[in-house]
Amino acid sequence: MKILKKISKVIVIVMAVLATIWCGLYVYANYFYNDKQIDVENFYIAELPLTPSQFEEDFKEIHQIVMENYSLYQAKHLNMDSLYQACDARVRQAQTTTDYGLIVQEYISALQCAHAITCYKRYTANQRVAFIEDFLFVDKPNDYLTEYGFQDKDRIIAINGLPYKQWIEQNEKYTEASTVPHRRLRTAYDAFRSYADTLRNYTLLRGGDTLTVTLPLKQRDYFPDNEEQTVESRILQDSIGYLTIKTMMNPVMEDFKAVYPKVKDLPYLIIDVRRNGGGNSMNGVNICKYFIREAQPHCVSKSYIMQPEADAYKGKIYLLTDTYTLSAAESFTLD
């Protein structure tokens, strides 16, 4: 009888533990994966659902949220009261949602944090420029740019009549970034994107000729979604593998696993995470497991111990990084 009672107690305890685990998983799933919890509606600043009389109160709420959640301003020696007062004075004078939206964009960018973003939609040509040795170039133009007369390797020397360096300097105030080089680079990449402009003039240098092209910038849904590979591989000189990891956003893990077998047995491997703006931290961690030799703590969370994969790379690794390597991509390089 005593044995039966003990068994009964054990069963009850096990059932209670299982019930607790189930409840925990249920709460976790509902809190973190319920779309209603994370649903966000994005707007073009010209279409913000606000009237001028609402600007000041809306901006006050934004500032309060920042103060409650952004403790890093102290380490960056930011005078938040001064920043708020300077922006608030301009908010009171704003007449349109475009005026107001650009002030908010400046405020967020002044936080000097690449993770602090407004999520405003931008008009675009769906094209990134090449920024090489502080020069702007058209790089493999898409059909839309080609239609308006752009050609590969055109050098952009002015935007809207401003020399391109001056244009970058004037627009850096709208760019979210943690460092000065990163801010400049990201601003250069915005040559074909804008929060407010729907039309831009570009002065191009092509060979020995100078020409001007007027280009409408479109809403993002004008362009079809192209599924670009997040990881690319190639082999140099028969013995050097080259992996370009463009992002840590999904589906990077699936793309990585598809190309990794092509390079895993080569004696040398170059991993290029330049221009990788980050994404999901766990993707960076899981990819890193293929390039470590022994268990080690994750650089961000020391309590998380990374274990090397069974088929982890055993050759010599060269890692390429730059001032645009950010967030999950940066922690990947540190690991």
Give the role of each language-model region:
Residues 2-268, 275-277:
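Flexible, low-complexity junctional segments that flank or bridge functional domains
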Residues 62, 332-333:
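Bilobed periplasmic-binding protein/Venus flytrap-like ligand-binding cleft at the lobe interface
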Residues 258-261, 288, 333-335:
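Short, solvent-exposed amphipathic alpha-helical segments in soluble enzyme
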Residues 268-270, 318:
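Hydrophobic "anchor" residues on beta-strands that sit immediately upstream
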Residues 270-271, 299:
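Short hydrophobic alpha-helical runs that function as membrane-insertion/retention elements
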Residues 277-327, 331:
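Gly/Ser/Thr-rich loop/hinge elements
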